[in-house]
Amino acid sequence: MKILIPFILTLFYSCEDKSTNSDTIFDYTMHKNNRVASLKMNDSDYDAWVNEDGFAINEDRLRVVNDLYNVFEDKYDFIFFVLNEPSIPENLLYYGRLVGVSNSVQGLGFQSYDNSLQYGSDGKLKAVMQLTGLEYLKYGPALHELAHQWANFALPTHSVNAPGEDLTSYLYTGHWGFTGGSIPGQLGGFRQNSLIENGNNSYTVESFGPFANGGNGVPYNEFELYLMGMLDIESVSDFDMFTNITSWSTNESTYDFTANQRTTYTSSSLVELLGSRIPSHINSQKRFELLVIVLTKESLSDEQWDIVDAHAEWFSKEESDGTSLYNFWEATGGVGSLNIGY
């Protein structure tokens, strides 16, 4: 009996513990603080996931997410995969990537869609994201990728590959490119009130990124917040979008560019173009459930657990930490919030 009783107790505990992996392809471990978890692949699966970008392969991504739902409840709006890598692997070409799963919001510039059943979710899951370094939840591009759930599908923005003369700009899907905003946006663009008109379609603005503006070091701008359902359209300041860009030069703190087409957007012209956002900022969802999973081929060390758990706590905190980085609550001006945990 002295041997049998511990055996029975252990068996009972294991049957109740979702981390036992009895019905899963991969091995799952939960952190003691119930915020983050790890998904352990064998060496060949993990190496293929990283070297062949398994996240971008629909079949591979669906396999992993469906397996998750054998362990975790279908209550999450977003699932974040975080690679257990010190920095972006050389085989991957992105710091973060979001794949939309479902979106029923109207007025964003696209038709609603719902592929959640393919992932094992009954309409709850909105998107899955991969961050290619262990610390990218805190330092970015976590905010940037979240913005892609709502933007940019609204405006036909333009960009160019590099500074130069006699350039031909191109449609810049998903980002703001050479577009102004209340501040430089998470998805790129310049500060509108820095715009100087030089004449002959020549302009000067504060330096900016057409693609992004510094990881989690900037909050969302007004138009981004509107698209996310966090701000009234009337609170979005007028801004300009420049296309047909033919030259771009960089100075110490400013950029000069020439663009043959300038389109000014106002709150009324945006509604005319996109239709009203439904649901509006009044009754839109502002609190989201987020699952953070570290993908790894080795068991996480105590230090690695501490890093990702602390970053998850910080990213979901509903207060300012007084640093130059923005968590989700800060980036939305205290309107939006995240719950990370299981």
Name each model feature, range by range:
Residues 24-139, 146, 254-342:
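Zn2+-dependent metallopeptidase catalytic core
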Residues 72, 150, 154, 231-232:
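Sec/Tat-exported extracytoplasmic proteins
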Residues 12-30:
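Bacterial Sec-dependent N-terminal signal peptides
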Residues 3-12:
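Sec-dependent N-terminal signal peptides
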Residues 90-98, 151-154, 160-162, 239-243:
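Short, solvent-exposed loop/turn and secondary-structure capping segments
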Residues 136-160:
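Active-site recognition of the HExxH zinc-binding catalytic motif
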